[in-house]
């Protein structure tokens, strides 16, 4: 499973049950990274990908149902039992600080940065894409 998350400067993900932000340039970069493969996510996340609905696999239990090598866009806390199936983590960083109730953390130190690059966002001056693997 290839997990994709969006984080603020404090690794925040959600505030009051809602995503902190979104950016169309980020969505375009993610869809380019995924290629022809489906992008799995829940119904809440799918609303921001309406223009690419034919490329999505929408399932509110997607983390339990997605298999090996599958791309998963995650906007909620990752259940601990999912981590053994995670092969890579792509982090998009907003370079802003937002209020957050849910934060992201790797479960251990087995993850190393494989790639990092900045690109201009649509509503964010700069977004950093980081790819981690075990």
Each model region followed by its residue ranges:
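Enzymes that bind and transform nitrogen-containing heteroaromatic metabolites
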Residues: 1-134
